[in-house]
From Swiss-Prot:
It comes from Oceanobacillus iheyensis (strain DSM 14371 / CIP 107618 / JCM 11309 / KCTC 3954 / HTE831). GO terms for biological process: L-methionine biosynthetic process from homoserine via O-succinyl-L-homoserine and cystathionine. Substrate binds at residues 163, 192, 249. This is Homoserine O-acetyltransferase. Its EC number is 2.3.1.31.
Amino acid sequence: MPIKIPIHLPAKDILEKENIFVMDDQRAITQDIRPLNILILNLMPEKQKTETQLLRFLGNTPLQVHISFLRMSSHESKHTSKYHLDTFYKKFEEVKSKKFDGMIITGSPVEHLPFEEVDYWKELQDIMNWSKENVTSTLHICWGAQAALYHHYGIDKHHLPQKCFGVYEHKLLHPHERLVRGFDDYFFAPHSRYTDVSISEIEAHPDLQLLAKSDDAGVFLLASKDGKHIMATGHLEYSAETLAEEYLRDHQRGVDTAIPENYFPDNDPKKQPKYRWKSHCSLLFSNWLNYYVYQETPYQWGE
């Protein structure tokens, strides 16, 4: 089934060229089906790139999905035009009276700051508190996962001696859990972060279950036992070239970032990286949408 998006969203043309099934509002109303309403809180600087990455996988499931984009009122985006934000994004005041079947909270390049020093932290806390009663399940990505662990479960992040940057092998810990159905026992996922969370703190928390970890990258995938919160500390949604683009960007800014590990063939940035996590991203999104959103959400909120 398709994702339902605004007719003029720039990502629409890109996705259609990739043979991703997208549908605009005019066509969607002709189908007698209630779509899943998914809210995406996009905290990434390059919002259009993140939109495309997420929609690529949200559109690859048997479910019709209606997408709404959310931005922060307490933060001014420097890398996305005001026109794009005003056209395609809502503010929290505009959506907080509604119910959503699922929500995605993306990463954000603010991990060097304590949570309380992030300019939109209070607003994000309000959104996360609101989600407890108004969203069936939330998928948190990278810094968004760390923010959720801190806010909901009191588990803080800590700084790494060097950036966790590359594609790492992960071990599946609970293969019979719904979220990881179809996953291989070992699989790859990209990471790009300067901070981490403690495996021991997660394993000791009675409301959390660690589902996948890496010897080199640490915690990767975990969930609350009630299914309300799914957290991925890496970026399965990244395209094959994203880490290369981040590496080049850092060096253009004078940041001496190491070559991403296990990424470029022969560690040569001139060579095309291998895309070896795409199928597991598809599984993660389809399992989340099916088992944690579609199967759990009421057909009509209030029932």
